[in-house]
A protein has these predicted regions:
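Tandem repeat scaffolds
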Residues: 1-217
């Protein structure tokens, strides 16, 4: 598999930070490949459609950055700040997003298959139509998130939700339980109770029990 920039691709806008802009320009001149953007401040950039497969964005500042339809296959984005970033239609297959911040990010139609999202804060994020099959969501905060028409399949889904989360059309199967926040109180819900709670919000999800999970391995 060949990684790097798509033929003729260029950022629609470069980062405001000079160091980050210079690094991005150097990467383009080098012909693409894996971009080392560890810790860089990429705010202000529009990187729509860029190919960042197997690149490094750990601890990078990507708040508000436009990343629509960008490819982050196997990218390391651990600890990155993606608050308010626009990743609509992006591919994050097998990416590492552990401990990243995605508060209020737009993730509509994004592909998270087999991605790792341990400890992610995605409160208020929009996952409308996102593909989350096989992704690991452990200790993730999805309070206030919009999961309309999002799809899961045998996902580790130990997450925190609240009454404002939108689950209309949310479908597939998960390994629970989840924590539901109601004010200052946290309630753990699993099994049939979790299925019913999701159903009451317009979703159709099967919660796989521990015994069923063991039978699958």
């Amino acid at each position: 598999m060949s990684f790097g920039t798509r033929r003729g691709w260029a950022p629609r806008a470069f980062p405001v930070d000079r160091t980050a802009a210079r690094r991005l320009q150097e990467w383009l001149q080098e012909g693409g490949g894996s971009l080392d953007a560890v810790g860089l401040d990429l705010r202000g950039a529009d990187l729509t459609g860029g190919d960042f497969s197997e690149s490094w964005f750990s601890d990078a500042k990507l708040a508000g950055v436009v990343l629509k339809e960008a490819d982050f296959y196997r990218a390391d984005m651990q600890g990155a700040d993606l608050s308010g970033a626009d990743l609509a239609g992006a591919s994050l297959v097998r990416s590492n997003l552990d401990d990243s911040v995605m508060r209020a990010a737009v993730l509509d139609g994004a592909d998270f298959v087999k991605a790792s999202l341990y400890g992610v804060d995605a409160s208020g994020a929009s996952f409308r139509g996102a593909r989350l099959m096989g992704a690991s969501l452990l200790d993730a905060n999805l309070c206030g998130a919009d999961l309309t028409d999002a799809t899961v399949m045998e996902n580790s889904f130990r997450v925190r939700l609240d009454e404002t989360v939108i689950l209309q059309g949310f479908s597939g199967s998960i390994f629970g339980p989840v924590e539901v926040s109601t004010g200052e109180k946290l309630t753990t819900i699993g099994g049939a109770d979790l299925e019913q709670w999701i159903r009451n919000k317009g979703g159709t999800v099967t919660v796989i029990s521990r015994s069923q999970r063991a039978d699958r391995h």
